[in-house]
Amino acid sequence: MDKPFRIYITGKPGIGKTTLLFNIYRILKEKNWRITGFYCPEVRVNNTRMGFKIKSVLSGKEAWLARVDARSGIRIGKYYVVLEDNFVRQLEEEIFSFPDIILIDEIGPMELSSVSLKNLINKILTSNYPVIAVVHRSIKFDDGVIYEVTIQNRDILLEEILGRVTSNKNNI
């Protein structure tokens, strides 16, 4: 049996990893791919980062992942991880609803500090579904193709990754 299709996108903060993943999402969506997964946008109030949400790619449902003003939960930097297990269970149902591909933004220390989210990420990465994930630069995987986004290559990676994804769709 072939190994599951995996692409990991990594690089320095602010280099364009999320932008690249959202462009991949947009183009695959236009081609009628069924896309599931999650992403973790920052939440700002008056230009101050207050925390991060976690949002479903499929439904747009969201919950708090981490907040600066919480006082319980695992602390990562100035944020406290407050993700509720119930939301992760709902997210899991959506993610495994027969997708063509699963997108994750991102797999990092904050996401992995939630036991329920870490378990979901492990379940995704051990599934047979194809996955494209943005990965924190401190985390390494050896079961797929790794793209490091740089200023020099960030404009050409979109076509390269899309070519790899679409050429593999028949094998997915």
Swiss-Prot record:
Catalytic activity field: a ribonucleoside 5'-triphosphate + H2O = a ribonucleoside 5'-diphosphate + phosphate + H(+)
Molecular function terms, GO-annotated: ATP binding; ATP hydrolysis activity
Matches recorded under Gene3D superfamilies: P-loop containing nucleotide triphosphate hydrolases (3.40.50.300)
InterPro entries named in the record: AAA+_ATPase (IPR003593), Nuc-triphosphatase_THEP1 (IPR004948), P-loop_NTPase (IPR027417)
UniProt keywords, alphabetically: ATP-binding, Hydrolase, Nucleotide-binding
Disulfide bonds: none
Function according to Swiss-Prot or TrEMBL: Has nucleotide phosphatase activity towards ATP, GTP, CTP, TTP and UTP. May hydrolyze nucleoside diphosphates with lower efficiency.
Entry protein name: Nucleoside-triphosphatase THEP1
